[in-house]
């Protein structure tokens, strides 16, 4: 009887240890909200709150490539988060903005760059890294982005991580 008890006890300990390890590793996969819980995502002067529910409306803001109205994301992009550009707003009186973090395939990103910027998406890998001293990235932590590349067009800054896969579309606005 004592031997069965010891075997059962060891099984319980192993199961609990595995459960703890699983819980710890899964916690790393859970994404952190783009804005702190309880913080308003509405910026003064901004046309929409900075959240996933208003993504379609946010993408209609400003001028996109070739002067057309609104913005777009790479084909098939998955939006990870939508956050307010609070640092830009603090530095620019009356300014507001949105930071849209997304993931997309390498091919979709290259096609997007060719279609929406003055650059050929084939050659992104050979371009110099984005300047961390630039005031265009105050709402994104460049230190967490490997080999960043950027392009600006109209009211937007496109920031990409190389190798390609992650990107940020930074839309800015201000009273005119």
Task: Give a label for each model feature.
Residues 72-136:
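Mature extracytoplasmic domains of secretory-pathway proteins
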Residues 25-27:
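Bacterial signal peptide processing site
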Residues 140-176:
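Extracellularly exposed regions in secreted/surface proteins, prominently low-complexity, repeat-rich
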Residues 2-13:
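Bacterial N-terminal signal peptides that target proteins for export
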Residues 1, 65-73, 136-152:
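Short, solvent-exposed secondary-structure boundary motifs
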Residues 30-94:
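Extracytoplasmic low-complexity, Pro/Thr/Ser/Ala/Gly-rich segments
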Residues 20-23:
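C-terminal motif of bacterial Sec signal peptides marking the signal peptidase cleavage site
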Residues 14-18:
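Hydrophobic alpha-helical membrane-embedded or membrane-associated segments
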